[in-house]
Regions:
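Cell-envelope/extracellular polymer assembly enzymes that use nucleotide-activated donors
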Residues: 1-4, 22, 32, 179
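Short, well-formed alpha-helical segments that are part of the catalytic scaffolds
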Residues: 11-25
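Conserved short acidic donor-positioning loop in nucleotide-sugar-dependent glycosyltransferases
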Residues: 23, 38-40, 66, 89
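A conserved acidic beta->alpha catalytic loop
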Residues: 29, 37-46
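Glycine-rich, basic loop-to-helix element that forms the pyrophosphate-binding segment
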Residues: 63-79
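Short aromatic/hydrophobic "clamp" motif used to bind/position activated sugar donors
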Residues: 84
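Conserved donor NDP-sugar-binding/catalytic core segment of glycosyltransferases
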Residues: 97-129
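Conserved nucleotide-sugar donor-binding catalytic segment
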Residues: 142-184
Length: 184
């Protein structure tokens, strides 16, 4: 199974190196890193092109500024992986075996379409673990109950490609991934 790590980039020159290096350090190597510049005014795209020039698994694209929703859509359309991992440009992956571990889960549990996991928010010197979901009792539930326990947004989730379509991405500058989350 191939991963597509999709990153919308906007004026992220100072963060991009940390993110790209954290992906390059993954022990599971069947992935592509799709970097899509959303009309940055800094040198983000130049840095992206340098990485793409040196690493075959990195692809760099640029487009006019339309916000993260359309930028993620562009990345989705350019991607070829079976598993999609949307990452913000100021994020990074702290564990070099994450893709390998996730790959193994999808191999063992082939009927899983979405994998939720915890993330750590870091603001200054403060770290907070954000759970990917809250546990609920097994059984039948109203869809609104399920929506309350699933964390919205595309971060901290791996999705099978076949559950998304291009029209699930909306043009908005903020909270655009909430819409996408509730469609799948």
């Amino acid at each position: 199974m191939k991963f597509s790590v999709i990153v919308p980039v906007y004026n992220a020159e100072k963060y991009l190196h940390r993110l790209v290096e954290s992906v390059l350090q993954q022990t599971y190597t069947e992935y592509e890193l799709i970097l899509v510049d959303d009309g940055s005014t800094d040198d983000s795209y130049a840095l992206m092109k340098q990485y793409a020039k040196h690493y075959d698994q990195i692809k760099a694209y640029t487009k006019e500024n339309t916000g993260p929703g359309m930028t993620r859509k562009c990345g989705f359309e350019k991607s070829t992986g079976d598993l999609l991992f949307f990452v913000d440009s100021d994020d990074w992956i702290t564990n070099s075996t994450v893709l390998e571990e996730i790959h193994n889960i999808f191999i063992k549990c082939s009927t899983v379409d979405v994998l939720f996991f915890d993330r750590e928010d870091v603001i200054g010197n403060t770290k907070e673990v954000i759970r990917g979901f809250e546990e609920i009792e097994e059984g039948f539930h109203n869809i609104n109950e399920i929506r309350e326990v699933i964390r919205p947004g595309l971060g901290a989730k791996i999705l099978k490609r076949n559950i998304l379509t291009s029209d699930m991405f909306v043009e908005s500058k903020i909270f655009e991934d909430l819409f996408t989350t509730y469609l799948y």
